[in-house]
Amino acid sequence: MAGAGGWDPLVGSEIHGFLTYPDLNYEKLVAEAAARWFRPNEIYAILANHARFKIHAQPVDKPVSGTVVLYDRKVVRNFRKDGHNWKKKKDGRTVQEAHEKLKIGNEERVHVYYARGEDDPNFFRRCYWLLDKDLERIVLVHYRQTAEENAMAPPNPEPEVADVPTVNLIHYTSPLTSADSTSGHTELSLPEEINSHGGISASSETGNHDSSLEEFWANLLESSIKNDPKVVTSACGGSFVSSQQINNGPKNSGNIVNTSMASNAIPALNVVSETYATNHGLNQVNANHFGALKHQGDQTQSLLASDVDSQSDQFISSSVKSPMDGNTSIPNEVPARQNSLGLWKYLDDDSPGLGDNPSSVPQSFCPVTNERLLEINEISPEWAYSTETTKVVVIGNFYEQYKHLAGSAMFGVFGEQCVAGDIVQTGVYRFMVGPHTPGKVDFYLTLDGKTPISEICSFTYHVMHGSSLEARLPPSEDDYKRTNLKMQMRLARLLFATNKKKIAPKLLVEGTKVANLMSALPEKEWMDLWNILSDPEGTYVPVTESLLELVLRNRLQEWLVEMVMEGHKSTGRDDLGQGAIHLCSFLGYTWAIRLFSLSGFSLDFRDSSGWTALHWAAYHGRERMVATLLSAGANPSLVTDPTPESPAGLTAADLAARQGYDGLAAYLAEKGLTAHFEAMSLSKDTEQSPSKTRLTKLQSEKFEHLSEQELCLKESLAAYRNAADAASNIQAALRERTLKLQTKAIQLANPEIEASEIVAAMKIQHAFRNYNRKKAMRAAARIQSHFRTWKMRRNFINMRRQVIRIQAAYRGHQVRRQYRKVIWSVGIVEKAILRWRKKRKGLRGIASGMPVVMTVDAEAEPASTAEEDFFQAGRQQAEDRFNRSVVRVQALFRSYKAQQEYRRMKIAHEEAKIEFSEGQLGAACRS
């Protein structure tokens, strides 16, 4: 598989962090596929850019270790049939697969399924696909043969293991090998090296850490040896032995420790900090797993000097009792949990989830404390680009009593990202900070990846200008203010542009009436502004905004009167295609809606893209503006002009849903359906008037004693009933209209007698469909009302089972009893009457007649539907919109936040209705 367009930017780079194809280096990943599992961001990059790679059309037969294959799940549904024998569930038929969702950053983005070989337990398969609905059809299958042995060793460890205090620092991870999805039981396999980098193997690099390791242990144990030469007590907690003892061990020891270490070992090295002592499940390795850990003698030093570049490697420290303690047993039950990479960690619930971090963090070599051990003097730089790796240098000094920790391994926590640091010199640490979500995060230094030992500073991730991520970020406060100012300038330019025109006397009278309806600005608003300015402690920024708004309001009144006097039917648009009402809707000027309504201009005036003021308000989530527009009579069922992305156009509810305003979208969808049905009723497209519909009206007195959550749920249920009833009535009206048109077309295209028969058949079919539909609705309502409790449903099921059995037994009895009589009677009729007396062929000679089927003339059909093509397309689009609207309302039940937004929108609409009614009443009194 090869990539195309190597230097073109990759899709989803802001998520996985690879900007171009060379950054991903897919060829290297394939080469490493047999040695390690892919990371979640690498998997996301491959699946999101699957067009660059080969998609297999058939399952691969018996793939070997290191095979990576891409399939289209919709095309190759049997991609799991690869010829291998995988471990089955208890039924012996279904493959036993465990699954989980992997996180990239803070969000779950990848779904993974694990399977383990039946014949070869060391052979694994992982299937990945994305949680994104648009990309979930592509699956990546990774096969890998691990180097592990059977982890389920005999429970009795060798005697010399219990006699020697040891350093149980085991560098291992394990995939989730098998899990029974039914019972929830998980079988754990403890491989020698399975991780996202392929683990650590014994090599010549092990010896490079000897000198630094000796210095490390010497510094830690020096003070303790002076105090007690027999018992070494470390200030940092954990179990330690000297590097000399480690180096003296045989190179190919089958166990973690051996008898050769016993003679040189310090008698007591079982040192556990208070925090670790209270967590009995922390840092303890199951004794049953010791048999699987082979050839660890060569790797001990390399395991102690942690491979900080590995993403999922982890150290698990075990405390083993020495002979002096009188206890050589190791707990057999160790709490295990799994991180997002499918790796099992033997830690307690309070230990940090290090497997989720981009870099692995070793277990703590210091006491867990909230006390500050170190003071940060300088951080350079204090920011980084969110899509690049940046080198950050931190300078700090340990306090006097903690100087002995200056040589310890240091980690920096940047938000949720833990990064291992390099010691440049004493007090100077270098960190390589990877990509991160833009924004400010907390930064502190730590020795264990969790507990801060320094003050918490601020670190900022910036967006690189010109990157694809910059366009997807939400606008900042400065951008929001700048956009508002631009809209205000456009509105002012549109209102203050003068176009003198001769006014007819009739229009002058009309303009005078409109001017009388619009009251002048109340003096109280000017006085409020003056009082704010008189306050010496007040701020002038909101006063400036209020002053500009009052000026625009006064000018808008004059401008609308001028438009009426000049005889304009609409208010016109500016150079960018928006009118004054659209700009006011964007800015949230609710007072402008009443002025437009009084002046007689349409509230559904469209801009150059077919957007109304309600579309703009819904798109920007302005609930007060939406409520004011709806109370003034704006139509929520209108759609925008079609675009290549949405050929059928978008409603205001669709626009609100696209921006994440689910509650607002549900409210607009409900109002759009009811408004459409009311419009059809007024135009007599349906026989059912709005007053006869079953649209639910909430009675406030019924819900006085309900909590807010219960009220939100009640109103959501009522909204769903309203939307479903309105959609059902609209579709029924459309079917009635279609039947009328088809009847008229058939009557014109066929003779009178034939046409009447066809029309009668069509009416019968239509009535039968309606009857079935109503019957199903009644049955559904009856089921809902009768089976709300478990007891009633259980009784119904038992009764139905008994009735079916009785009916079956009775029918069988009746058939068996009458069978011989029927056969004898038919034989007599055939032989005696038909064949002998009538001299005919009998029943066997009667040809089975073909059923008469009513057909419609094929030549007349195009004539009846030719002019309906665009109507049919429009109706299909309308039905899709209705279904979408019902789904939007139904989505309220998945989010309490959306229910709150819906309730808030409903209350705002009711208040806006009252305010608009009072304004209309005042205008009528003035006129």
Swiss-Prot record:
GO biological process terms held by the UniProt record: positive regulation of DNA-templated transcription; regulation of transcription by RNA polymerase II
CDD domains: IQCD
Calmodulin-binding: annotated segments: 826-845
GO molecular function terms noted in the UniProt entry: calmodulin binding; double-stranded DNA binding; sequence-specific DNA binding; transcription coregulator activity
Keywords for this protein: Activator, ANK repeat, Calcium, Calmodulin-binding, DNA-binding, Nucleus, Repeat, Transcription, Transcription regulation
Ranges for domain IQ: 757-786, 799-828, 882-911
Gene3D superfamilies: 1.20.5.190, Ankyrin repeat-containing domain, Immunoglobulins
Keyword hit for Cell membrane: no
Main location: nucleus
Transmembrane intervals: none
Motif position, Nuclear localization signal: 72-79
GO cellular component, one term: nucleus
Localization per record: Nucleus
ANK repeats: 609-638
A Pfam cross-reference name: CG-1
Regulation: Transcriptional activation activity is strongly reduced by calmodulin.
DNA-binding region extent: 26-152
Stretch forming the signal peptide: none
Coiled-coil boundaries: none
Region (Necessary and sufficient for nuclear localization), start-end ranges: 70-96, 830-851
SUPFAM superfamilies given in the database record: Ankyrin repeat (SSF48403), E set domains (SSF81296), P-loop containing nucleoside triphosphate hydrolases (SSF52540)
Function: Transcription activator that binds calmodulin in a calcium-dependent manner in vitro. Binds to the DNA consensus sequence 5'-T[AC]CG[CT]GT[GT][GT][GT][GT]T[GT]CG-3'.
PANTHER family: CALMODULIN-BINDING TRANSCRIPTION ACTIVATOR 5, CALMODULIN-BINDING TRANSCRIPTION ACTIVATOR CAMTA
Annotated family: Belongs to the CAMTA family.
Name of the protein this chain belongs to: Calmodulin-binding transcription activator CBT
Source species of the chain: Oryza sativa subsp. japonica (Rice)
